[in-house]
Design a protein with these regions (language model features):
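Extended, loop-rich substrate-binding clefts of extracytoplasmic carbohydrate-active enzymes
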Residues: 1-45, 154-178
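Preference for bulky hydrophobic residues occupying beta-strand positions
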Residues: 34-36, 66, 196-198
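Short acidic/polar mixed-charge low-complexity motifs
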Residues: 28-30, 58, 70, 190
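Short Pro-Gly-centered flexible turn/kink motifs
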Residues: 60-62, 184-200
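Short beta-strand segments enriched in hydrophobic/aromatic residues
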Residues: 25, 68, 198-200
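Polysaccharide-binding surfaces and accessory modules of carbohydrate-active proteins
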Residues: 21, 37-159, 205-253, 257-261
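Conduit-forming functional cores of very large proteins
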Residues: 39-44, 169-172, 182-185, 200-202, ...
Length: 265
């Protein structure tokens, strides 16, 4: 987030297979905790973003937008996105909106060839809380209007969440975003957790079949524990106990970094 308020404290806690950012806003009396990790032990890949908002002040109504300001769709190489951005965006599309888990992809392959080939698969973006899936805002104009730097969501700041959620969205000829819109009343010290998975899926049916499995209330917490245990399992070979715990963890991390690049011994 863009926040220049001196009364905001931000810290980062890093583990071998996950990390957490904790931001406490003493001006508006709320705390945000964001945890990232790679989903382990599943037949599909995902980057997990787990966000917990805590109200530190009196009971209040919160309007929350959490997500990504840009999603480059599947099928567009980074080099072509930078050199032919206007052409590449004309191929972009979004599907699976009816199931609240959009799939972002380029309709055709971007190769300069005589034969046009259809892309298969896309990048999914799944947001959910204890009540189920939440369809994200996918049109950046709904939030940022003409603010092309994507730093300040003008429509959200000026008109609120209801206006943004009711905006007539379009996904053709543009690079999409993905923001989950949430309105919550939180009492003192009450928190709210929003989880997001993003990754690649071969088709809509594949990711739709996984939705009930992922929506289990303990799913994210269980997977976070598994992710941390996975790193410990593969670094126990070099487990070291010295007078400095930081040095002990340095040995583990160096070992992990090396075999991820060069292979497990």
């Amino acid at each position: 987030s863009v926040n220049y308020d001196a009364k905001v404290k931000r810290t980062m806690r890093i583990k071998a297979n996950s990390f957490r950012i904790i931001e406490t806003d003493y001006t508006h009396n709320f705390k945000t905790e964001i945890t990232y990790f790679i989903l382990p032990h599943e037949p599909f890949g995902a980057l997990v973003r787990n966000v917990t908002f805590t109200n530190l002040g009196e009971e209040a109504d919160f309007e929350i937008l959490d997500g990504m300001s840009r999603i480059i769709p599947y099928g567009i190489p980074g080099t072509k996105f930078t050199t032919m951005a206007n052409l590449m965006r004309s191929y972009n599309t979004v599907s699976n909106l009816k199931n609240d888990v959009p799939l972002f992809f380029s309709r055709i392959e971007s190769d300069d060839a005589a034969e046009m080939k259809e892309n298969v698969g896309g990048y999914y973006y799944m947001c959910f809380d204890n009540n189920g899936t939440i369809c994200p805002i996918y049109d950046p104009c709904a939030l940022f209007e003409n603010e092309t730097a994507l730093q300040f969501p003008i429509n959200f700041i000026m008109h609120g969440l209801k206006f943004v959620a009711g905006y007539s969205q379009h996904f053709t000829n543009k690079i999409s975003c993905a923001f989950a819109p949430v309105a919550k009343k939180l009492s003192t010290n009450q928190n709210y957790t929003l989880s997001t998975l993003c990754g690649f899926a071969h088709n809509e049916d594949f990711i739709n079949r996984l939705i009930p499995h992922i929506l289990d209330k303990e799913y994210i917490n269980k997977k976070l524990v598994e992710a941390d245990q996975l790193a410990l399992k593969y670094t126990n070979d070099i487990a070291t106990t010295t007078g400095n715990p930081i040095l002990d963890e340095y040995f583990r991390q160096s070992y992990l970094d090396n075999f991820l690049r060069g292979g497990y011994p």
